[in-house]
UniProtKB/Swiss-Prot annotation:
The chain crosses the membrane at residues 1055-1075. Keywords: Cell adhesion, Cell membrane, Cell projection, Developmental protein, Differentiation, Disulfide bond, Glycoprotein, Immunoglobulin domain, Membrane, Neurogenesis, Repeat, Transmembrane, Transmembrane helix. Residues 1-58, 69-160, 165-263, 268-355, 360-442, 451-541 form the Ig-like C2-type domain. It comes from Danio rerio (Zebrafish). Belongs to the immunoglobulin superfamily. L1/neurofascin/NgCAM family. It holds the Pfam family fn3. This is Neural cell adhesion molecule L1.1.
Amino acid sequence: EFRQRDPSPSFRWVKDGKQFGEVLSESGTLTPHPTMDLHFYQGTYRCYAANELGTAVSNLVHLTTEPVPSLAKVKKQKRRAYEVGESAVLRCNPPKSSVTPKIHWMDMQFHHIPLNERVTISRDGNLYFANLIANDSRDDYTCNAHYINASIILPKEPMSIYVTPSNSVVKNRRAKLHHPAGARSSYLVLRGQTLTLQCIPEGLPTPEVHWDRIDSALSPNRTKKLYNNRWLQIDNVLESDDGEYVCTARNSENSVKHHYTVTVEAAPYWTRSPEEHLYAPGETVRLDCKADGIPAPNITWSINGVPVSGTDVDPRRRVSSGKLILSNVEFSDTAVYQCEAVNKHGSILINTHVHVVELPAQILTPDERLYQATAGQTVMLDCRTFGSPLPKIHWEILDSIPALSNAKISQTTNGSLKISNVSEEDSNRYTCSVSETNKSISADVEVLNRTKIVGPPQNLHVIRGSDAILHCKYTVDHNLKSPTVQWNKDGHKITASTSNDKYHEIEGSLKVLDVQMEDMGIYSCEVSTTLDSDTASGYITVQDKPDPPQSLKLSEKMERSVTISWMPSVENNSPVTEYVIEMNEGETPDEGQWQKYRSVSQDIDSWRSICSYSKYHFQIRAVNSIGTSAPTESSLSYSTPAAKPDTNPENVMTLSTDPKSMIISWQEMDRRQFNGPGFQYKVFWRRAADSGAHWTESSVSNPPLMVNNTGTFVSFEIKVQAVNDLGAAPEPLTVIGYSGEDFPLEAPSALSVTELQKTSVMVRWSPVRPESVRGHLLGYKIYLRMKGSQWETPGRAVSSSGNPTVIEVPADAAEKIVSDLQFYSDYTLTITAFNSKGEGPHSEESFSTPEGAPGPVLFLPFDSPSESEITLRWEAPHKPNGEIRGYLLQYQEVVIGSESPQHVESIDLPAVTEFTLKNLNPESRYTFHLSARNDAGDGAPAIQSGATLLDGEPPSVINMTAGETSVNLSWVPGDRHRNLGFSFRYLKKIEGAEWEESEKINSTQAFYQLQGLDSGVIYHLQVLSGNTSYDWDFKTIYSPEWHKSPRNFATEGWFIGLISALVLLLLVLLLLCYIKKSKGGKYSVKDKEEGQGDAANQKLKDDAFGEYRSLESDMEKCSISQPSGCESKRSSNDSLADYGDSVDIQFNEDGSFIGQYSGRRDPRGHDSSGAVSPVNPNMPPPSHSFPTSVTGILGPN
């Protein structure tokens, strides 16, 4: 068949080198004549197609004719008898044909005979039995030959096999080969064909077949194993398949081999074919034609079907190394040139058209084409031309620089410009021009950044059932569109989406859900743009706990040992670290409790400590870093015979509590140590003093055993033996035990107490006689009880009924140091001996401890009556450790960078708890050290620091925030200043207005609100305190509603006065009730002092705190609406009144208190001026910048 040419060609056929038939004009198809014998047409054909431009020639066609295959008449085969295990061959021998038929072995119902390792078919159609079984007996083995080209199936005569039982003693048969015969065979195969090697064995048991290649490894990609490994097939054979192959057939009896020598040759095939072009007169034409084959083919040339001889008369033509060279071509050289390659396996022919013509040059590639590429790629700039002679083109960069001057740039034979490994500097305009013409085109090259994966997927180890996330981070040139990210697993595309149950793709990352073993593999991320792509991959290794161990076996079964073995587990990508042997001693594996017996690292273990008369069930688990496997699918059981006990019970002892009996006890033996039925404990005992006496014995099933009438604390020899129905254990060890103990009869004598230090004494005694202990002497107990402190008054003495301190000492001790006693206290001490029954009589002794230095005093908040005075207050030490004789006060001025002189004041009155220091520097702080004194010396000092308070002053800087009918006034109180009373005066700046004045205000209050002002009016404000005054102006906010609405009666003066009177009356009634309720009450501090102080000290404290109560009563009589009166009353009292309001002030860890003076009150004080009143009813919330009430500045500094 030829490509159609213009003008239309004529066709003629040549058969076996001679003209065959007439010349055909319309079609080259050759049709046989129906009356002619087909055998007449058998031969080798070649077709010639010719027109004005030349003659083309076809490849050789070989036509073979043959009659339709048919079966010859044959005699019916006799039924053949075989023994079980013998081999057999049923031969097909189909009619011969040029095309091998396909063979089907079937029965009479057209069911295929099953093929397996034992029953195999060969390429020649024979049916082979490696060994026969009884089921192979049948009468309808039929070979059906299917001729596909003839479309017929020829069934041969059925064959019969009868299989009888074997009488042979030998049960197995050695392996050998049915087909092929011998030890070696050779095969010749052509390149591109299919090679099939057969290895059909016989033997019992059925042999296994294994294929190998001698000279190299057998490639799994190039070979296929068919018919249960009996055929080895290689499709599309290559020269590399040439070599030696071997088949090994093996069963339990032996192995047999067959070697195959495969030789690969090849019919001719093209490696280079000539190209068709248009040529101009005078050009040189080179037609290059190369072919390969085994053996190497011979190449010849023809022109229009006429061979070119080696001595061509035309000197312009010559053949060299398969090339046909035409020099200085003319129009008459237009023709079809044939190149033909021939070897013994066939021939191939190719036609090449040479057209000599003159045509003007043209550029076929469009102008202004843009080429985009990424760095590192190769760019091909097209410049396709047409013309004869062939146009000569050249390239320039920016219309001036020759392109070929760049080492990276080359020009192909078709005129294209090749730029290799492009970079950013290659981004330019390139011009292609045709020489000796004005024709040219331009092309632009734009080089972009490469697409690059900067964060490739990582290799992950994932536990089965969890999720895995593979990240793929990349960079792309901003001039390119968003890339596509494609994930692949083992080279196959993954379709990921948010709706996919397995794969989710999130911003380029791949999430694999619920990872299973089949998800393990190589995952690659491919980032693609319109210009380039990049690929990176990572591996997901799925880990899981191991599979259960397999093939659990018990071997070497002995009376007391057994060997356990098993097949190792599948590790599931995490190495097995150990195997756990579990044991169950129930009657069945479902009964009892599975327990861990031991862990081992290998897959075998010997257990050599099995108990007799026991049943064991075993199972194995494998352990890796992920977890523990399920147990082996089935457990194994092992029972041991009964035997005498091997051991006796341990820890035999006496646990007697009754003086006239003995309890013998021991540690019960494990049931597995019984070793047989009828297990009991046999207990023996006799007095230790009568070592030759007869043993008394008793048998019991479990401990303990009680022996009566033994006497008090008598020693016995005791032993316990294990017995069962098969006998007794070895002779047990004898131990010494005792009957029950009784209380000791005597107390330790010669008890004495000697003072070592002021708070420790040495206690000595004489030990009790051993016979009086009536048991094992466990030691002595010293009971220490404090009767009271000598410095306490009789009414406040500590009771001695509390629990005493108990000190135990060992039995061999005769003295003991008792420490940590209290100073100046009375003690009672007793001592007794004790055994396991209890304590004996006590010996008693009394003693006292001397005085010691007092404990520290407790500083209370102190006051500053003036700028140069401080009054200190304190409580007496909680532990005086003697009689307090007075106090030592030391103080000094705090001077930074230097040491100031220290002042000392000795206070010789023990009942005094306050002291006033005068003539202090108001500008300095002081440190105070106060110690209590008794006859033993001075106690540890309490340390406090502080400074005096300065005189108060009214605020000079006020922050004002005006509203419609009020103004908020706030200020910052001075540091260390006393509270000072003052008031605000304010005046409307209108004609005829009069001054108004607020109530009295505390300087420490920090906030006040003037109410009842007119809207939109300017006011003048003054602060008055003594002869001091400060002035300000402010304006309230204008409110149209306030000016429009009539004055409500609630704002009238008479109504406000009425309401104020009612509120005042109610408050007076409440205060009277409170005063009546608290009348005669005592201050809690006084109650505390009454419980600890003496009568002389009590009188002074009652007088002092009486003043405090007077102040409190006076304050209660003050109205909340009259703070100025309260302030006046308070300031007229002495300094102790300020102390009364400061009892809640706290102390720091170093002893200094936080709110130091009454001028800085605790928020719970009683004299706050910020209480709601008819004049000042709405207090604003606290501010972080300024205190908003009097309580805001009374707290800690």
